[in-house]
C-alpha cells in the first residue's frame, strides 16, 4: 500500500518561458515524461529528474495548428503524438543523440572498478541525449477531444462524433473513421444486436481509455453518459463494434481503467468516482464500488470538491489518485479503502486554525514503480502577475511515496531504502520450516512484530541503484533476511545481476534465496537457489531450467510454486543436500497444473499461494496432517479469490517402500470462487493445536468492505459434527486501519498510517511549499479483530464456536478489552437505532460474557465509557446494577464494586446509593483497602447532602449530541477523576465536582460526619475486641483516626482486657513475634505461694536488686533507686549473650505453656512481666506505644528499665498524673536520653534533678522554660548548642559561668545581652 513521505520536491525548468505547462504524460515504461505547454513540448527523464529536450513551435506553425492540448506516447517510446487546437495531430519521432550519446555521464575517480559488462550498461545509469523531429501533421478537420495509444495505431476522438484510427506511420496506411451513431448500445451485450441508437446525434466522446484485459474502450460522452465499447474482431469497423451503457449515470467527466483488476473508474460532477466491472456472464456494466468522501470524516468539504478532474491508477494498479476541479488529492485502494486526502486535517489547516487554499492540479502522472507522483499545478486567476512569474518555474511537483508488499512482516520500500520493523530478532521463525505443533511457538513473536513505532531504515547503496533501480521487494517473509539480501546484492551486483534480471520475485527457503530470473547470456528462464552463507555467485547456486517465463513465485514449507506466462502452475520440491563441501539444494518438478481455461490473461493474476486450508472435506483430516501438507492453491485473479484443492474422492495410492516426499500427488479439483474484491490474502504455514480456529483460517483484505475471515468450525469435545452444518464460514468485519499483516495467534492486525507535522515557521508574502504541505511521516498501527469475529459468530447462532475461540484466546493480555469492545459496539448500535430491533444481540452477548470471570469488570467498564442515556438499555440486558454490585462484594472485588457504585449513584435515589456505599465502606475497612476507604469517606460526605430523594431522570436516546454522554457527569456531585483504564489497574478516584452549599447545610454535613464517625468507631471496636492491634494502628494512620482520644473514652469498655493470656498470644501472632524462650534448667517450680514464680538461674540470682524485684509486692510505690541497680544493669548485656548461647545449645522451650496457669485478673497484670527473664526485654522494645495504654498504671514500676526507652511519649498522657513522678524516679538514669521531650511537660520539676545529665541533650529547648532554675547548673555543657535562644532569658544567671565557651557562637546576640555580664567574655 502507498504512503506519502516527506515534502514534495520542486522541479525547476532550466528554460525560461512565459508559458505554463498544463499536461504531463508518462511513457509506457515511465522512464520518460512528456510535459506540454501551449507551443512547447519537453521530455524529462525520471531518474535523475532532469530535462532532456524541449521542442518549441514557431509562431507561424502555432497559428496554423493551434495551441497544443494533449499528448500521447507510442508503446515502444519511439514516437509522440500531440493534438493541436485546430484539429491537427502532430507526430514526433524521438531520435537518440548522435555526437553526444548521453546527456549526463557520471565521472568516477581513477582506479574505480567500473567495467561495461553487458550492452546498455551506461544507458541505464545515465540520462540519454534525445532529439525531437516532427513528421507530417494529420488534419482531422474537427477539434480533437482525446487521444488513445494502441500497439500499432492511434485512436483519436473528435468533436464531430467520429472515432479515427491512425497508424503511427501516417504516410503508409492512412486513417479510418467510425461514426458513433452507427455503434449499437444496450444495457448488456446479449441484447445489443438491435438497431443503432439514434440518440447519439451530436454527441461525441469526451474521454476514453483502452483496457487490454477487457479488450475494449471505456468512454465518457460529452453529455455525461458513460459506456464500454468492445470490438468483435481485430479490426475497427462499423459492423464490428458494440457497446453497453451504465444505467442512471449522466454526469461523467473522465475515465481511467485498471488492467490488472479489469475495472473502469468514471469521475462524476458530484465529486464521486464510480468503479465499474464487466459481468462475465451478461457483459453488462456492473457497479463494483464508489470512491467518495464521506461526511463522517470530511464534514466541511465532502460535497464541495467540485467535479472530478482526473483519475490515475498506480503502475501496479493497486491504488488510484483522484483530483477535483476545486483542488486537492485523494488516494484510494483498488477496492475503495481510503488512504490519504489533502482536503482535511493538517493538509487543509494551518497551525493557527486558518484554512489553506487547496492545491489545484491541471495534470498528474505516476512515476516508475509508483515511487513518485508528478503533478503540474494549475494557474490561479487570483494570483498577481509578479507572483505568477515566481511560480512559473515551480509548477512541476514530485510527491514521494513509500509502499508495502503486504507480506508476513510490516515492510515498506522506498525509492532507495527499506523501512523494516524493529523488535527482538530471536522470536522470528523461518516460514519455510515445517515445525510440528508440539515444537512450534505459540506466538509469532508479539514483541518482534509489534516492536515499537520506530523504523529500521536500510539505505541501499548507490552503486547497486545505478544499474538495478528501481528496486522491488517480493515475498519478504523475514525482515532480517531482507536486510541481508540487500547487502548481498550490493556486494555482488557486478558478478551476477548484470547477467540476469529477476522476473518472478524472491523468496526464502531455510538458508537459501529462491530466485526466478531470466539469464541474458543463455536467454533462458531459470530458477536459482543461492545459499546464504556464500557469495551471491552462480558458482554457489543451484540452477534449474524453466520452459516458460515466470511471473509469480512463492514458497510453502519444502515446496515452491511458480505461476508462468502460459497460465500454468508448477510445483517443485526442494531438498537440502550435504554431499558437497558447501551446502546446496536440489529442485525436482512435482506437478504441473494448466489454468488456461480459467485465466483469460496472465496479467490478471495478482498472487499465487500454497496453503493447507481446505473446504468442508478438509476439516475431517487430523490437525498435524492438514497443517503440514499442501492441500490447496489460492489464486487472486483480478480480485476474485479462486481455490483449487486436491481431489480426495478416490483412493490415495502410495508405494510402501517409497519415501513420503516421493508419494504420488493427487490431482486438483476444478477451481471454486471463495470471495470477490480481494486485495490481499494471508495464511499461516504453522500449526497450533490450542488455536486451531485462528491458525487454520484464511484472512482476506477487501478494501472498502473491510476484512473477511474464512473460519473453520470444529465440533466440541471431538464429537461428530452435524451433517447439516458447514465446516467453514466466511465472516466479514470492518477495521479502522489498512491491514499490512495479520498476527494469527495474537489476534492482531498490523498496519501503517500517514502522520503529518506542520511547518509554519516561514513568514513571507509568498507562501512556501513547506508551509503549503505538512511534512509526512509513516507510523505503525495495530488493531484487535477478535471481538468482530466473536460477534459475527453470535449473530449466526454459533455461540459454541465463539466460546471455543474465546477460550483459546483468554490468555492474551488484551482479552478483557476484547470483551469490552464487543459489548460496547453492540450496545451503541442497538441502543441508538431509530427502528425497533426484532432480535437484539445484546442479551446474547451479555450471556456470552458471563462465561468468563471478567464479566463484572467488562460490564462496568463498558458502562463507564458509554453515554449515560444508554445505561438503562445496557442493564436491562445484563442485569440490575444492584445485583451486580452485590456479586462484586461477594467476590471480594471491591474496585469493581466501587465502579458499580458510581452507576448506582446516577441511577438510584441517594438513600440506595448511601446504603450500598456503606456496605462497600465496611468491606473495604475489613480488607484494609485504605485508598478505597478514603474515597468512600469523601463519597459518603458528598452523597445525598444536596439531592432530593428521587432517582435521576433518564434522558431519551432519540436525539443525542456528541457530548450528551458527558453533560450528566458535569451536573452530578460525584465523578471520576481518573480514566476508566485506571480502574482496570485497581485504582480510581471519586472527586467532588460541585461545590457544596454552606450555611443551612451545616446540619446535614455534621450528620454525614457523625454517620461516618460511627462506622469508624464500630470498626475500631471490632478490631480492638479481636486484639488486632496492628490493624488498628494501620487503620488509625491511614484514615487519620484519633486513636488516643478514642482509647481514653473506651478504656473502661472495649479497651479493658479481660483475658491477658489470649491478648498476649494474639499480640505475638499479629506482629509475628516469637514467644519467649528460656533454657529448661532455669525452671524449677512453676508455682510458689499460689502464684506463678519462676526460679531464675544462678547467674541471675547474683544480682541482689533483681532478687528483690522478683520477691516484692506489686504496689504503686516503687523501691528506691540504688547504685546497685546501675551495676546490675551494666551486666545485663553479658548475661543476655550467655543466655543466647545457652539457648542455642541447650534446646529452647517456649513460654506459652508456662503462661497458661496465670490468673486472669486486672490487678495482677503487672505480675506477668515479672516472670519474664530480663534477656527478653529487648523484644518488648519494638512494642507499639499504644499497647501500653491498656496496661494498668501499677504495672509500670515493675517493668524492667530496658523496656522504657520504647515507650512513646503519648502513652504518658493516658496514665494517671499521680503515677508520673513515682514512675520516673524508679527508672534508671541511663534510659532517659530516649524519652521524648514532650514527656517532661507532665513531670514535676522536682524530678528533673535526679535525671542523669546525659538525658538533657535530647530534650527540646522549649521544655526548659518549665524546669526550675535550680536544675540548670547540673546540665551538661554539651547540650547548650541545641537550646533555643529564647530559653536563655528564663535561665538563672548563675548557670552561665559554667557554660562551655564553645556554645556561644550558636547563641543569638540578643540572648547574650540578657545573660550576666560576667559570662560574655
UniProtKB/Swiss-Prot annotation:
What positions belong to coiled-coil segments? Answer: none
Q: Where in the cell is it found?
A: Cytoplasm, Cytosol; Membrane
Q: Which GO terms describe its biological process?
A: intracellular protein transport; retrograde transport, endosome to Golgi
Gene Ontology molecular function: guanyl-nucleotide exchange factor activity
User: Which keywords, in A-to-Z order, does the entry hold?
Assistant: Cytoplasm, Guanine-nucleotide releasing factor, Membrane, Phosphoprotein, Repeat, WD repeat
What GO CC terms are in its UniProt record? cytosol; Golgi membrane; Ric1-Rgp1 guanyl-nucleotide exchange factor complex
Identify the InterPro entries for this entry: Ric1, RIC1_C, WD40/YVTN_repeat-like_dom_sf, WD40_repeat_dom_sf
Where are the stretches annotated Disordered? 945-964
Annotated TM spans: none
Effect of a null allele: ric1-null mutant larvae show micrognathia, small head, shortened trunk, and short, kinked pectoral fins. Craniofacial cartilage elements and newly formed ossification centers are present but they are malformed and smaller than in wild-type controls. Chondrocytes of mutant fishes retain procollagen II intracellularly in large inclusions.
> At which residues are the WD repeats?
63-102, 303-342
Subunit comment: Forms a complex with rgp1; the interaction enhances rab6a GTPase activity.
Q: What job does this protein perform?
A: The RIC1-RGP1 complex acts as a guanine nucleotide exchange factor (GEF), which activates RAB6A by exchanging bound GDP for free GTP, and may be thereby required for efficient fusion of endosome-derived vesicles with the Golgi compartment. The RIC1-RGP1 complex participates in the recycling of mannose-6-phosphate receptors. It is a regulator of procollagen transport and secretion, and is required for correct cartilage morphogenesis and development of the craniofacial skeleton.
Output this protein's name: Guanine nucleotide exchange factor subunit RIC1
**Native species of this protein?**
Danio rerio
Amino acid at each position: 500500500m502507498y504512503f506519502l513521505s516527506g515534502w514534495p520536491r520542486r522541479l525547476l525548468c532550466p528554460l525560461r518561458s512565459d508559458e505554463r505547462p498544463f499536461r504531463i504524460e508518462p511513457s509506457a515504461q515511465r522512464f520518460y515524461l512528456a510535459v506540454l505547454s501551449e507551443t512547447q513540448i519537453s521530455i524529462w527523464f525520471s531518474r535523475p529528474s532532469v530535462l532532456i529536450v524541449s521542442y518549441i513551435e514557431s509562431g507561424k506553425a502555432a497559428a496554423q495548428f493551434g495551441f497544443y492540448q494533449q499528448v500521447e506516447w507510442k508503446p515502444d517510446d519511439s514516437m509522440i503524438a500531440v493534438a493541436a487546437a485546430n484539429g491537427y495531430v502532430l507526430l514526433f519521432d524521438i531520435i537518440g543523440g548522435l555526437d553526444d550519446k548521453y546527456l549526463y555521464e557520471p565521472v568516477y575517480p581513477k582506479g574505480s572498478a567500473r567495467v561495461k559488462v553487458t550492452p546498455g550498461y551506461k544507458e541505464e545509469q545515465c540520462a540519454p541525449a534525445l532529439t525531437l523531429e516532427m513528421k507530417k501533421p494529420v488534419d482531422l478537420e474537427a477539434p480533437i477531444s482525446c487521444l488513445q495509444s494502441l500497439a500499432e495505431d492511434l485512436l483519436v476522438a473528435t468533436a464531430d462524433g467520429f472515432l479515427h484510427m491512425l497508424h503511427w506511420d501516417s504516410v503508409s496506411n492512412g486513417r479510418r473513421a467510425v461514426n458513433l451513431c452507427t455503434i449499437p448500445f444496450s444495457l448488456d451485450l446479449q441484447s445489443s444486436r438491435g438497431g443503432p441508437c439514434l440518440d447519439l446525434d451530436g454527441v461525441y466522446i469526451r474521454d476514453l481509455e483502452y483496457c487490454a484485459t477487457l479488450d475494449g474502450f471505456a468512454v465518457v460522452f460529452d453529455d455525461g453518459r458513460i459506456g464500454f465499447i468492445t470490438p468483435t474482431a481485430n479490426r475497427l469497423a462499423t459492423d464490428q463494434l458494440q457497446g453497453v451503457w451504465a444505467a442512471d449515470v449522466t454526469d461523467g467527466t473522465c475515465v481511467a481503467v485498471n488492467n490488472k483488476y479489469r475495472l473502469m473508474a468514471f469521475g462524476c460532477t458530484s465529486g464521486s468516482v464510480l468503479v465499474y466491472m464487466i459481468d462475465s456472464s451478461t457483459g453488462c456494466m456492473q457497479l463494483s464500488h464508489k470512491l467518495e468522501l464521506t461526511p463522517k470524516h470530511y464534514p466541511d468539504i465532502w460535497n464541495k470538491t467540485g467535479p472530478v478532474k482526473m483519475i490515475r491508477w498506480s503502475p501496479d494498479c493497486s491504488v488510484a489518485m483522484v483530483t477535483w476541479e476545486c483542488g486537492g488529492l485523494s488516494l484510494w485502494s483498488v477496492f475503495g479503502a481510503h488512504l490519504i486526502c489533502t482536503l482535511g486535517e493538517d493538509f487543509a489547516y494551518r497551525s493557527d486554525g486558518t484554512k489553506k487554499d487547496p492545491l489545484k492540479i491541471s495534470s498528474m502522472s505516476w512515476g516508475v514503480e509508483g515511487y513518485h507522483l508528478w503533478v503540474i499545478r494549475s494557474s490561479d486567476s487570483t494570483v498577481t502577475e509578479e507572483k505568477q512569474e515566481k511560480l512559473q518555474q515551480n509548477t512541476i511537483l514530485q510527491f514521494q511515496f513509500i509502499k508495502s508488499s503486504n507480506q508476513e512482516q510490516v515492510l515498506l520500500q522506498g525509492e532507495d531504502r527499506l523501512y523494516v520493523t524493529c523488535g527482538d530478532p530471536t522470536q522470528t521463525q523461518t516460514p519455510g520450516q515445517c515445525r510440528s505443533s508440539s515444537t512450534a511457538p505459540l506466538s509469532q513473536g508479539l514483541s518482534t512484530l509489534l516492536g515499537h513505532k520506530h523504523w529500521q531504515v536500510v539505505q541501499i547503496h548507490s552503486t547497486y541503484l545505478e544499474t538495478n533501480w528501481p528496486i522491488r521487494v517480493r515475498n519478504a517473509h523475514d525482515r532480517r533476511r531482507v536486510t541481508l539480501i540487500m547487502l548481498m546484492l550490493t556486494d555482488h551486483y557486478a558478478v551476477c545481476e548484470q547477467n540476469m534480471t529477476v522476473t518472478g520475485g524472491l523468496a526464502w527457503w531455510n538458508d537459501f534465496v529462491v530466485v526466478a530470473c531470466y539469464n541474458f547470456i543463455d536467454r533462458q528462464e531459470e530458477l536459482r537457489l543461492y545459499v546464504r552463507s556464500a557469495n551471491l555467485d552462480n558458482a554457489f547456486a543451484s540452477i534449474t531450467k524453466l520452459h516458460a517465463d515466470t511471473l509469480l513465485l512463492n514458497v510453502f514449507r519444502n515446496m515452491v510454486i511458480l505461476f508462468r506466462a502460459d497460465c500454468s502452475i508448477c510445483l517443485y520440491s526442494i531438498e537440502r543436500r550435504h554431499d558437497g563441501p558447501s551446502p546446496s539444494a536440489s529442485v525436482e518438478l512435482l506437478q504441473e497444473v494448466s489454468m488456461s481455461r480459467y485465466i483469460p490473461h496472465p496479467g490478471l493474476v495478482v498472487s499465487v499461494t500454497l496453503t493447507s486450508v481446505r473446504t468442508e472435506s478438509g476439516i475431517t483430516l487430523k490437525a498435524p496432517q492438514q497443517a503440514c501438507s499442501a492441500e490447496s492453491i489460492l489464486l487472486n485473479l483480478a480480485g476474485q479469490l479462486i481455490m483449487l484443492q486436491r481431489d480426495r474422492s478416490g483412493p490415495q495410492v502410495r508405494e510402501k517402500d517409497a519415501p513420503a516426499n516421493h508419494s504420488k500427488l493427487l490431482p486438483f479439483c476444478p477451481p471454486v470462487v471463495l470471495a470477490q474484491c480481494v486485495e490481499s490474502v494471508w495464511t499461516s504455514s504453522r500449526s497450533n493445536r490450542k488455536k486451531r480456529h485462528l491458525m487454520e483460517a484464511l484472512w482476506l483484505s477487501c478494501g472498502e468492505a473491510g476484512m473477511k475471515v474464512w473460519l473453520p468450525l470444529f465440533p466440541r469435545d471431538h464429537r461428530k459434527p452435524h451433517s447439516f452444518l458447514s465446516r467453514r464460514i466466511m465472516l466479514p468485519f470492518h477495521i479502522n486501519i489498512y491491514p499490512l499483516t495479520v498476527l494469527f495467534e495474537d489476534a492482531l492486525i498490523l498496519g501503517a498510517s500517514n502522520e503529518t507535522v506542520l511547518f509554519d515557521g516561514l513568514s513571507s508574502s509568498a507562501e512556501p511549499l513547506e508551509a503549503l504541505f505538512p511534512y509526512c511521516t509513516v507510523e505503525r498501527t495495530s488493531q484487535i479483530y477478535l471481538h468482530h469475529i466473536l460477534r459475527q459468530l453470535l449473530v449466526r447462532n454459533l455461540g459454541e464456536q465463539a466460546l471455543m475461540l474465546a477460550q483459546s484466546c483468554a490468555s492474551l493480555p488484551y482479552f478483557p478489552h476484547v470483551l469490552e469492545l464487543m459489548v460496547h459496539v453492540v450496545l451503541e448500535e442497538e441502543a441508538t437505532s431509530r427502528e425497533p430491533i426484532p432480535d437484539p444481540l445484546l442479551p446474547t452477548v451479555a450471556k456470552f460474557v458471563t462465561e468468563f470471570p471478567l464479566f463484572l469488570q467488562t460490564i462496568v467498564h463498558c458502562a463507564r465509557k458509554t453515554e449515560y442515556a444508554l445505561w438503562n438499555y445496557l442493564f436491562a440486558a445484563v442485569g440490575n446494577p444492584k445485583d451486580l454490585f452485590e456479586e462484586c462484594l461477594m467476590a471480594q472485588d471491591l474496585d469493581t464494586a466501587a465502579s458499580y457504585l458510581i452507576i448506582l449513584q446516577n441511577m438510584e435515589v441517594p438513600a440506595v446509593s448511601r446504603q450500598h456505599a456503606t456496605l462497600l465502606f465496611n468491606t473495604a475497612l475489613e480488607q484494609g483497602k485504605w485508598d478505597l476507604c478514603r474515597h468512600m469517606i469523601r463519597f459518603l460526605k458528598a452523597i445525598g447532602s444536596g439531592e432530593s430523594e428521587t432517582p435521576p431522570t433518564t434522558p431519551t436516546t432519540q436525539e443525542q449530541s456528541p457530548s450528551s454522554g458527558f453533560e450528566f457527569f458535569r451536573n452530578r456531585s460525584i465523578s471520576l477523576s481518573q480514566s476508566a483504564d485506571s480502574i482496570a489497574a485497581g485504582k480510581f478516584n471519586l472527586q467532588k465536582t460541585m461545590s457544596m452549599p454552606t450555611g443551612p447545610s451545616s446540619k446535614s454535613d455534621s450528620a454525614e460526619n457523625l454517620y461516618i464517625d460511627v462506622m469508624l468507631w464500630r470498626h475500631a471496636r471490632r478490631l480492638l475486641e479481636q486484639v488486632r492491634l496492628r490493624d488498628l494502628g494501620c487503620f488509625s494512620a491511614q484514615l487519620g483516626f484519633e486513636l488516643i482520644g478514642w482509647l481514653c473514652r473506651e478504656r473502661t469498655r472495649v479497651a479493658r482486657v479481660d483475658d491477658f493470656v489470649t491478648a498476649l498470644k494474639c499480640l505475638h501472632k499479629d506482629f509475628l513475634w516469637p514467644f519467649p524462650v528460656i533454657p529448661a534448667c532455669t525452671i524449677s517450680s512453676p508455682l510458689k505461694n499460689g502464684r506463678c514464680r519462676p526460679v531464675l538461674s544462678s547467674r541471675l540470682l547474683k544480682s541482689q536488686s533483681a532478687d528483690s524485684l522478683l520477691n516484692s509486692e506489686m504496689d504503686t510505690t516503687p523501691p528506691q533507686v540504688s547504685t546497685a541497680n546501675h551495676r546490675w544493669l551494666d551486666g545485663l548485656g553479658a548475661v543476655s549473650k550467655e543466655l543466647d548461647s545457652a539457648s542455642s545449645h541447650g534446646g529452647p522451650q517456649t513460654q506459652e505453656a508456662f503462661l497458661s496457669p496465670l490468673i486472669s485478673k486486672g490487678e495482677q497484670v503487672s505480675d506477668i512481666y515479672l516472670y519474664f527473664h530480663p534477656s527478653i526485654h529487648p523484644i518488648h522494645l519494638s512494642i507499639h506505644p499504644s499497647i501500653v495504654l491498656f496496661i494498668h498504671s501499677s504495672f509500670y514500676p515493675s517493668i524492667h528499665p530496658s523496656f522504657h526507652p520504647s515507650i512513646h511519649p503519648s502513652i504518658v498522657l493516658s496514665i494517671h498524673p499521680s503515677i508520673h513522678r513515682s514512675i520516673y524516679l524508679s527508672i534508671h538514669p541511663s534510659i532517659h536520653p530516649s524519652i521524648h521531650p514532650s514527656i517532661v511537660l507532665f513531670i514535676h520539676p522536682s524530678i528533673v534533678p535526679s535525671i542523669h545529665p546525659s538525658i538533657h541533650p535530647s530534650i527540646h529547648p522549649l521544655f526548659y522554660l518549665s524546669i526550675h532554675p535550680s536544675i540548670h547548673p547540673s546540665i551538661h555543657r554539651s547540650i547548650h548548642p541545641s537550646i533555643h535562644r529564647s530559653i536563655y532569658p528564663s535561665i538563672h544567671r548563675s548557670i552561665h559561668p559554667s557554660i562551655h565557651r564553645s556554645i556561644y557562637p550558636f547563641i543569638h546576640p540578643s540572648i547574650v545581652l540578657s545573660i550576666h555580664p560576667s559570662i560574655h567574655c
